Regions:
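Short, acidic, small-residue-rich periplasmic hinge/interaction motif at the N-terminus
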Residues: 35, 49-51, 83-87, 100-142, ...
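A short, solvent-exposed loop/turn motif at the edges and junctions
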Residues: 51-56, 79-94
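Short, acidic Ser/Thr/Gly-rich low-complexity loop/linker segments typical of extracellular
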Residues: 52-68
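Short acidic/polar hinge/loop motifs at secondary-structure boundaries
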Residues: 72, 149, 155, 182-210
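N-terminal periplasmic accessory domains that precede
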Residues: 104-107, 149-150, 191-194, 208, ...
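Surface-exposed extracellular loop regions of Gram-negative outer-membrane beta-barrel proteins
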Residues: 223, 227-241, 299, 310-316, 506-508, 537-583, 603-625, 629, ...
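Outer membrane beta-barrel strand-and-loop segments of large Gram-negative receptors
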Residues: 430-434, 468-483, 573, 577, ...
Length: 816
């Protein structure tokens, strides 16, 4: 039996070897560029068709964002043509192609008659899967109509947003969020809160880059999320108006306008919104005596309303100073006022769970926020394709103020009433200078170099009356100068990209009220490397490495920033150091006619990783110890995971997108502190956690052209050194219908259909407290949105049809 099996295997091997060694038809490389006649603007997703004279077989490819195409065809006689929706075809006469050839620049002219008579219904896919990144196109996602950028990110593959608005990529909260490829003042001082205020309608797409090249900011151990703001691209005057209303009480409107000619492009966006986001939380805690016996129980019940009213405006102009020089200027404003009443009841019980009293704490808070940013960009294009120089400038200012009056009393005892006032004023200034140079070398080489200077100053003034012990003024200064260079090339089926980034950091953390001054100066080299191999046009694999940094900011550093609870207080740590991460990613991409599949295995090793610890403060409220939560540096964190994404279109009327991520996280470290009794308390944070996350999105076109979209997510349980989070499932629904001859649409979306989206935690501090908590930032929401489009319908340049496989054709590995 074994001999027969051996003979069969050898025979099969010889047959396969002989088949693999058969002579293949000669392949040649065809390249070139497609532009719009008259404006010289590149045409993205134009199709280059090669039709074999004898067999009539079709082959070819599409252009990238720069209008450039490059693909292989079998040598032979062809008729060649360039096609682009609403443009006249360009035909190239019959010719024999036997060697590599550059077709040069192909100019295409708009077909005016066709534009008048045709409504183009093809559209961008919601999610595009590429080997090195995922692109989420906001425009076609019904779930985020009338929502915020936080809602947008919560629909992006690989990204999760927890109940408090914290953004994580593959479960890693060490994420750098960019706007239009740069750090931006629009993200505000508290980025989680800012993302809840920015309207989704202002965003065109979101790019998720898990292992960025040296060109990008080195910050973000988990990767980079780049939010690309909307800017009209179609010729003439175009725009859209959107109005929405929902329950809980929510309403708003936004207007997008742009006017484009050969010499300039004016773009603008204005939005107004009023939102009420009621939420709630609970904590059930059991406190212990020093000998481990139960001391008491406390039930904490919290309700809050987060009412915000604000506007945002963005105005800009692209000036085509010449065919090779463009100057862009943009000015953005954002203002918001908030009312955030927070009402907490503490129900006290003795060790036998007999009621002993009830305390009420009302935090009546109002807030105001204003952000302004001016940005300018110069782009110089040289004669050779992709040879260019860009210079970016940005200046931003942010102000965030919070004023609160806190009323605290024992129910039934008016004399116990205590009143506190808190004022929290924040100011931020950020200046940015960035320049990037790209030089193509030879047939497939690419050299890049650049500089980025980021200069930031934050001032936080926190005042508590009448208890001045909790008051503090914190000054944070961050100056980072960065230089990078990288080079990439391609030969046969291999391509590579090697880069090195150097960052010199000067950080000051000064607690002015406490006379505590900290200055930290450090510099780091951040290497990056990517190797890619293409098995075929539809299958490729890549291996990448990068070094990343995560700098603590804001509440991580401020010793005092909130008193919303008087027994559970968050306290920043001004001595915390940045963490450094080595990231390795192995990815595979496969495309079929109806399916795109991307999978990756990744490893992140982080030194000085951030970890939140809880400890006794030495203070008591009615005999209850006040617990402090504070961040520290642990020695190491190991994170290894596996992820896959897929787009599947089984039918023209049904599209599926799925994302699954699982990872194992191991932390190693010990922490010791001296408690209020003078005892040295040692805590071991060695912990191994395993968890997973999945999201499935289904979009179905029903009869009468009604679109139905369903999003279902599940976050599995996860343990940590002092407890665990429990699993949570949630679902969103949306329906949309185009009306008025496709010039308008109306949509209905329901967020958190089962009202189940919460953060559920179990915490254990030995001989101190065991607790169970639930936190729901926003209850179920229902929203109706009406959108009207004028002079653009669905035939804008930025809505050209993409392949069903959502492939990233033309992407050079490592290229941003």
């Amino acid at each position: 039996m074994n001999k027969k099996l051996l003979i069969a295997v050898v025979t099969l091997f010889i047959s396969l070897t002989a088949f693999a060694q058969r002579p293949e038809s000669k392949k040649i490389t065809v390249s070139g560029k497609v532009i719009e006649k008259g404006t010289d603007l590149p045409l993205e997703y134009a199709t280059i068709v090669f039709e074999n004279i004898k067999t009539k077989q079709l082959s070819g490819g599409i252009t990238d964002e720069n209008g450039v195409f490059k693909f292989e065809v079998v040598a032979g006689n062809y008729n060649v043509r360039a096609e682009y929706i609403s443009f006249k075809n360009v035909n190239i006469s019959q010719k024999e192609y036997n060697s590599d050839i550059n077709l040069g620049i192909i100019q295409m002219e708009a077909d005016v008659a066709q534009l008048k008579d045709i409504d183009i219904i093809a559209e961008k896919s919601t999610v595009e899967i590429k080997l090195d990144k995922r692109v989420y196109n906001v425009g076609k996602d019904m779930m985020v109509k009338g929502g915020t950028v936080s809602d947008v990110l919560d629909n992006v593959p690989s990204v999760t947003v927890d109940a408090e608005g914290t953004v994580a990529l593959r479960g890693n909260e060490s994420v750098k969020i960019l706007i239009d490829g740069k750090p931006s003042g629009l993200a505000g001082i508290n980025i989680a809160d800012a993302l809840k205020l920015l309207p989704a309608d202002a965003v065109e797409k979101v790019e998720v880059i898990t292992n960025p090249s040296a060109r990008y900011d080195a910050e973000g151990g988990g990767g980079i999320i780049n939010i690309v703001l909307r800017k009209g691209k179609a010729n003439g005057v175009n725009g859209s108006i959107m109005v929405n209303a929902g329950d809980p009480e929510t309403y708003g409107t936004s207007v997008n306008l742009n006017k484009k000619s050969d010499d300039y492009n004016l773009f603008s966006n204005f939005g107004y919104n009023y939102r009420n986001n009621p939420g709630n939380s609970l904590v059930d805690a059991e406190y212990f005596n020093a000998d481990g016996t139960t001391s008491r129980f406390i039930e904490e019940r919290r309700t809050n309303d987060r009412i915000s009213e604000g506007y945002n405006a963005n105005f800009g102009i692209d000036l085509n100073l010449s065919k090779s020089l463009t100057w862009t200027n943009a000015l953005t404003f954002r203002e918001n006022d908030g009312k955030n009443p927070d009402n907490v009841y503490f129900n006290y019980f003795d060790a036998s769970y007999n009621p002993t009293g009830v305390r009420n704490r009302l935090n009546d808070q109002i807030s105001d926020e204003f952000s302004m940013e001016y940005s300018s960009n110069f782009t110089k294009k040289f004669k050779k394709d992709d040879h260019k120089l860009t210079v970016d400038l940005a200046f931003s200012q942010n102000k965030e103020n919070e004023y609160a009056t806190i009323y605290d009393q024992i129910i039934g005892d008016p004399s116990s009433l205590e009143t506190q006032g808190t004022t929290n004023k924040n100011k931020q200034q950020r200046n940015l200078l960035q320049t990037d140079y790209v030089l193509p070398i030879g047939k497939s080489g690419r050299f890049e170099a650049g500089y980025r200077g980021s200069f930031q100053k934050n001032l936080t003034d926190f005042v508590v009356t009448p208890i001045s012990d909790f008051s503090n003024t914190l000054e944070y200064v961050e100056n980072v100068n960065a230089f990078y260079t990288q080079y990439g090339s391609k030969f046969n089926k291999f391509s590579y990209f090697l880069g090195l980034r150097f960052e010199d950091s000067h950080i000051e953390v000064n607690s002015l009220s406490l006379n505590n001054y900290n200055t930290k100066k450090y510099n780091n080299f951040f290497p990056s490397a990517t190797v890619n191999y293409e098995f075929s046009e539809s299958s490729s694999v890549s291996l990448s490495y990068s070094k990343r940094i995560n700098r603590p900011r804001g509440r991580f550093l401020n010793p005092v920033s909130s008193l919303s609870s008087n027994i559970n207080i968050f306290q920043g740590n001004p001595d915390i150091d940045p963490s450094l991460t080595d990231a390795i990613d192995l990815g595979y991409l496969k495309k079929w006619s109806k399916l795109t599949f991307n999978t990756s295995a990744y490893i992140n090793i982080t030194n000085d990783a951030f970890q939140f610890i809880r400890k006794e403060s030495g203070l008591f409220v009615d005999g209850v110890p006040v617990i402090l939560s504070t961040p520290i540096n642990l020695s190491k964190e190991y994170r290894a995971g596996f992820e896959f994404n897929l787009n599947y279109t089984p039918y023209k009327w049904w599209r599926l997108n799925g994302n699954f991520n699982t990872f194992r996280s191991e932390t190693q470290g010990d922490y010791s502190y001296v408690d209020y009794l003078g005892n040295t308390i040692s805590q071991n944070f060695d912990n191994v956690a395993f968890t997973w996350f999945t999201r499935i999105t289904s979009k179905i076109t029903l009869p009468y052209k009604i679109d139905w979209q369903t999003n279902a997510t599940y976050n599995a349980p996860q343990t940590n050194a002092q407890g665990k989070s429990l699993g949570v499932a949630s679902m969103n629904l949306a329906f949309s219908k185009d009306i008025l001859k496709d010039k308008a649409s109306i949509s209905l979306n329901i967020s958190d259909v089962f009202n189940s989206r919460k953060r559920i935690m179990e915490t254990n501090i030995p001989n101190v407290v065991n607790s169970y908590s639930e936190m729901q930032w926003r209850v179920r929401q229902v929203m109706v949105t009406f959108t009207y489009r004028f002079n653009k319908q669905k035939n804008e340049r930025d809505r050209q049809p993409r392949r069903d496989d959502n492939g990233g054709e033309g992407d050079f590995m490592g290229r941003p």
